[in-house]
A protein has these predicted regions:
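Short, glycine-rich nucleotide/cofactor-binding loops
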Residues: 1-6
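PLD/PLD-like phosphodiesterase catalytic module centered on the HKD motif
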Residues: 7-164
């Protein structure tokens, strides 16, 4: 996920983890964006605080080298229903979800035993487990605990005074 910082989304993810849902997030480090060096906001302060508030949530960083993990991909696996994927252009920030940017997302419900969900599972597991390469890093490798960064993220997310 490129940007994940919208308060309601974070809370819903945390509450799902508390209910026993296996929530796994692979997020961009927000250290680079389109050739410019960034300070890690919003993902690092948002997701590190999410982990502190909800211990059962699982988060890894996508390991980038000057590029960004620009993915906007959410995949839901259910016990008794068909899998669902949400794909598109929207980041999960207030500015994007409250229509400040023109974005399009698509919800794709798939047959449980079809090729698409199997391929999505395989892709996610490869990244999560670093199968065949070094794709992701533990959350702790780039843990953001600075008070200033946490406050800055919250102010920017709340007001929309940011580029994300």
């Amino acid at each position: 996920m490129f940007y994940l910082s919208e308060f309601r989304i974070l809370k819903a993810l945390g509450e799902a983890a508390e209910r026993g849902v296996d929530v796994k997030i692979i997020a961009d480090l927000n250290k680079d964006a389109f050739g410019l060096e960034k300070n890690g906001s919003p993902n690092r302060p948002a997701l590190c605080e999410l982990k502190e508030d909800y211990k059962d949530i699982n988060i890894r960083w996508y390991q980038t080298s000057g590029e960004q993990f620009h993915t906007k991909f959410i995949y839901f696996k259910f016990k008794d229903k068909n899998p669902l994927a949400i794909l598109g252009s929207a980041n999960y920030t207030r500015r994007n979800l409250d229509n400040y940017n023109l974005e399009t997302n698509l919800a794709l419900e798939m047959e449980k035993n079809s090729d698409i969900p199997r391929e999505m599972d395989k892709y996610f597991k490869r990244l999560w487990n670093n199968e065949g390469g070094d794709y992701t890093l533990p959350l702790e490798d780039h843990y953001e605990k600075r008070f200033f960064m946490r406050i800055l993220w919250k102010i920017q997310e709340k007001t929309g005074l940011c580029t994300w």
